[in-house]
Amino acid sequence: AVVREKHPGLLLIVAPRDPSRAAAVQRLFAAAGFATVAMSALSARNPALTVEVVVIDTLGILKPLYALADVALVGGSLLEIRGIGGHNPLEPAAFAKPIQFGPHMKNFRQIEQLLLSAGGATQVTDARRIAASLGELLTHHELAVRMGRQAHAVFTANQGAVEKTLASATALLDPADAHP
């Protein structure tokens, strides 16, 4: 609400981990006083301009939406929930977006550290810190652009990591490369 007051016209796009939870997430935001709609319900007759929160209820559309974002808050990382451990912060980094994530990024520790060290991400731990960081990035465009570039540099440096790992493992396991 604090960020909304200082930055009217903001649009929040929420992507539940499981799209079948979209209706429940939509009800939570509506109960909190936000004008909310499911992504599948958007149309020319129901423009996003009159909406504050769009809840994604379809698989496979999140990545391209990062291109439209000003800032990305990577979920699954604010609370310690068994089996989650954060979502992939390289997805918004690919689009040069400044990134926020919580302290529970156990599935992406190395990338988390690289993004924080490079200045491409901010770690937030509660609603107050999310609002402060988001407000700063929305107010200071040059900071958001710089963070986005730094996040993209981390993405670029880590492209092909799976292929590099496979090539290294193959070389180690290939008997033709064994030395007496």
Where on the chain are the PLM-derived regions?
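Nucleotide-activated sugar donor-binding and catalytic core shared by glycosyltransferases
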Residues: A1-P180
